[in-house]
Amino acid sequence: MCNIAGYTGNRQAAPILIDMMRREEGYWGGYYTGIATIDNGRVYHAKVVGDVETLVRETDALRLPGTTGIIHSRTPSGGDREWAYPFVSCDGKVAFVENGIIGSFEKTTDFPAAAMDLKKKGHKLSSCTTDEIKGYPRLPDGTSVHYSEVQCHLLEELLYSGLQPLEAMRELLRRWPCEDVGVAIHHAHPNKIFAARFNQPMTLARAKGEAFISTTPLAFPEQDFIGVDVLPANACYEISANGLSVINAIDPAVRVCPITPAVFVQALQDVTAKLQAAKEPVPFSVVAETCKFPQGGIPQMALLGYLVLESLLKSGKVVQTTIRKDGMTAGLTAPVFMISWK
């Protein structure tokens, strides 16, 4: 799983994005991290194996120009720097990040076939490796590839076909669905962020002349907001500093389990019991797994977990601390936020 943040507004995006990622990478990130911004019709990006501090130390991430951008950090898997987000299209016009899994669409979403088709069309997939990476597509030519990079290049093809970015994002998830949320920026739209959300979490906060998105509201800066909202599931969004365009129902046939007041109360009770019974602090993944219900559709356990955790932190009933675990390579460590009952 992963953490994502985005910003568009009237300030330099990079420092804001880095601050937001520091606030959330310990939930489900810290092993691969990257950032992308737009300025003067050009997409800039930087990425590393490591956490956000590694990104700042080893790249010019803090100095990337532009007032619109996205940032991403994720859990360990395998692969080198090319397995970090963002993924960038061959023409350099699109940067794409994603959070999620193929999940229940594994039998219908054929990323190996899509990847081979892209290769035939001349696309260069930089994440291709002869190493076998567990949980990621293995291609007929014996290589493994990050399916999110395949998504990025499929998005590029959809844009070449004449679709506008918002429509292209919808078509991407409609034709190659995953249990995920995808976010993109496009060089020709320097003041917009495009998102397509099936079930993984995405929240939106607004201030005067600014819009922020994040995996969890716990990542938002400490400032006054006009409003903070969860972006509804199974929909696509064009986000600007002063507006929001929506395409509902990426796929009307897909049912995402709603988070009703009753579901939230049950999750709050279950997480409370889990934390009270725990003999030592637990990572956020334990909170999220406790929220893996109801049945009968695609769950929103990550979003539900973040909403419950936010409630518990605000009430002062839990404490969040940070430990560091071994990173992807020797000498690197990753932050992990640990939750405990007071």
Description of each model-found segment:
Residues 1-342:
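Conserved short alpha-helical segments that host acidic/polar catalytic motifs at enzyme active sites
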